[in-house]
Swiss-Prot record:
Domain notes: The NG domain region, also named G domain, is a special guanosine triphosphatase (GTPase) domain, which forms a guanosine 5'-triphosphate (GTP)-dependent complex with a homologous NG domain in the signal recognition particle (SRP) complex subunit SRP54. The two NG domains undergo cooperative rearrangements upon their assembly, which culminate in the reciprocal activation of the GTPase activity of one another. GTPase induced rearrangement of SR drives SRP-mediated cotranslational protein translocation into the ER.
CDD domains registered for this protein in UniProt: SR_alpha_SRX, SRalpha_C
One GO BP annotation of this record: cotranslational protein targeting to membrane
Protein name: Signal recognition particle receptor subunit alpha
């Protein structure tokens, strides 16, 4: 089974190409041109590229190159004959067009060689099946005939080799004892201390002697290692007659030092935060500058190098192969041509956690974009669709509006008012944790932060924010900022109106001169009407500068449902004429999904809003900005 067969001129014009199993022959052919033809390494007509074996034939008279590719694990004996037959027939059939040796004549020439090639391929395959009848192998040709006869004879009373090896240690203990022998079985000459040779009636081959010498050498050194191991074990003193008590896994612990809880503690005071490991809390990296998200790995780097090979080849061809860059247009794409490829792409996107409806819409958009487009000769339907899909995904992840919080905060400072950010989302996605990360990032950039605890529903929500505030205060104490308090928690306990607490927090921040107010809200499901009404009221009354939706990178179809219903609820329950909707997205738990990054596509596609932050860990420095190309590369990785 052939992957491809192509015929092109040394000027770079593809005259004819047959696509078999392989999706595209561009990469292997470019590698052949760069590594073999341009380097004048044509001594061998075979070349291996990744999983393919390429065989080629040069026609120096007409400046043609014939290349065939197939899987390197296959042994196709008819390939050489096929290349010769194709070369001969193609040259004779199109001699007139080829002899003109001009690019225009080759462009205008019609090389309808498909039927002839299939006929030659069928004849070559049939000829390879006609072989001489196989004969049965003789005993002299077998491996058993090459072994010495002595090695296949088992003497009565002789133990097999494996049992003899296992019983060597037991027999060594009995050696040197004064008692009578435990057995009277005859010992073969090869296992006794007697020399083995013709004088004892045993003849061994040269290979058998070498093998026995090797075994004796290994046994001598093995005994030395056993003695050294025994000596090291015996060095450790052991108490005789005493047995260490067994410690059960779930049996508790009776150690007094472990059970003693009477030591004084600070019970969560700020002094306890100062004694904690600051580096462990802070994490590694520069907190003031957001790094781009990196989704690559060692496999991705290798794939990236392979993907850059065709482009590098195009830059180095020059001269003789300078016209290789898509001068010939072969066919225009239709929906029937792209149907099977788009089905595979859709399944691939769904497997990478893209919502099913959005995957269908993306493939439909690509089909509309490519319908009627003319492909290049070396371009296949798969490569063309994949390239168009990649461009569409990058465009989706780069929306028109870009959220620059630092610039907006500086603008709010000039107006002498705090910059207000509200966090919303479903339960358990990490709103409070990522609020603390963003607080640390703002503190590293020199802005003071007031955290408003407006989650008055979940037990422990205020205590969680108090812990983050204490740790952030330890990282940025007032002493480092001229006595100015950089981070503070504003809370009114549980059961209060969240909108009223947010309003008081904003007024407090304005009076105390805080730069940013981060409002934490309670987690709520998108179908909970009372809680969604309370959220819409909070946003309408306080009019924050930025509304961030916090979502997990683990969700698939659920992401679409969450965002659609959140926006719908904010619009339905808002009392303003122009309701305030979600402005941006914070994508959390991105370090747990490997390359299944489809949630980023789903959330951005459904809202047309940017992903402002990406959470990648559990320390304050584990905050990244989205790199669209890295996400798309991870998404398209097979």
């Amino acid at each position: 089974m052939l992957d491809f067969f192509t015929i092109f001129s040394k000027g770079g014009l593809v005259l004819w190409c047959f696509q078999g199993v392989s999706d595209s022959c561009t990469g292997p052919v470019n590698a052949l041109i760069r590594s073999v033809l341009l380097q004048e390494r044509g001594g061998n007509n075979s070349f291996t590229h990744e999983a393919l074996t390429l065989k080629y034939k040069l026609d120096n008279q007409f400046e043609l190159v014939f290349v065939v590719g197939f899987q390197k694990i296959l042994t196709l004996t008819y390939v050489d004959k096929l290349i010769d037959d194709v070369h001969r027939l193609f040259r004779d059939k199109y001699r007139t067009e080829i002899q003109q040796q001009s690019a225009l004549s080759l462009l205008n020439g019609t090389f309808d060689f498909q039927n002839d090639f299939l006929r030659l391929l069928r004849e070559a395959e049939e000829s390879s099946k006609i072989r001489a009848p196989t004969t049965m192998k003789k005993f002299e040709d077998s491996e058993k005939a090459k072994k010495p006869v002595r090695s296949m004879i088992e003497t009565r009373g002789e133990k097999p080799k494996e049992k003899a090896k296992n019983s060597k240690k037991k027999g060594a203990k009995k050696e040197g004892s004064d008692g009578p022998l435990a057995t009277s079985k005859p010992v073969p000459a090869e296992k006794s201390g007697l020399p083995v040779g013709p004088e004892n009636g045993v003849e061994l081959s040269k290979e058998e002697l070498i093998r026995r010498k090797r075994e004796e050498f290994i046994q001598k050194h093995g005994r030395g290692m056993e003695k050294s191991n025994k000596s090291t074990k015996s060095d450790a003193p052991k108490e005789k007659g005493k047995k260490a008590p067994r410690v059960w896994e779930l049996g508790g612990c009776a150690n007094k030092e472990v059970l003693d809880y009477s030591t004084p503690t600070t019970n969560g005071t700020p002094e306890a935060a100062l004694s904690e490991d600051i580096n462990l809390i802070r994490g590694t990296g520069s907190g003031g500058q957001l790094q781009d998200l990196d989704c690559s790995s060692s496999d991705d780097e290798g794939a990236a190098q392979n993907s850059t090979k065709p482009s590098a080849t195009k830059g180095t061809l020059g001269g003789m192969f300078g016209m290789l860059k898509g001068l010939v247009g072969s066919k225009s794409l239709s929906r029937e041509d792209m149907e099977s490829v788009l089905d595979k792409m859709r399944d691939h996107l769904i497997a990478k956690n893209v919502a099913a409806d959005i995957a269908v819409q993306l493939c439909e958009s690509v089909a509309n974009k490519l319908e009627g487009k003319v492909m290049g000769t070396f371009s296949t339907v798969t490569s063309t669709v994949k390239q168009a899909l990649q461009e569409s995904l990058v465009q989706i992840l780069q929306p028109q509006r870009r959220v620059d919080m630092l610039r907006d905060i500086m603008d709010a400072q000039r107006r002498q008012r705090p910059y207000v950010v509200t966090f919303c989302g479903v339960n358990g996605v990490g709103k409070s944790t990522n609020l603390a990360k963003i607080s640390f990032w703002l503190l590293e950039n020199g802005f003071s932060v007031l955290i408003a605890a407006c989650d008055t529903f979940r037990a422990g929500a205020v205590e969680q924010l108090r812990t983050h505030t204490r740790r952030l205060s330890a990282l940025h104490p007032p002493e480092k900022h001229g006595g100015r308090t950089m981070v503070q928690l504003f809370e009114k306990g549980y059961g209060k109106d969240a909108a009223g607490i947010a309003m008081e927090a904003i007024a407090f921040a304005r009076n105390q001169g805080f730069d940013v107010v981060l409002v934490d809200t309670a987690g709520r499901m998108q179908d909970n009407a009372p809680l969604m009404t309370a959220l819409a009221k909070l946003i309408t009354v306080n009019t924050p500068d930025l509304v961030l939706f916090v979502g997990e990178a683990l969700v698939g179809n659920e992401a679409v449902d969450q965002l659609v219903k959140f926006n719908r609820a904010l619009a339905d329950h808002s009392m303003a004429q122009t309701p305030r909707l979600i402005d941006g997205i914070v994508l959390t738990k991105f370090d747990t999904i490997d390359d299944k990054v489809g949630a980023a596509i789903s959330m951005t596609y459904i809202t047309s809003k940017p992903i402002v932050f990406v959470g990648t860990g559990q320390t304050y420095c584990d905050l990244r900005s989205l790199n669209a190309k890295a996400v798309v590369a991870a998404l398209m990785k097979a």
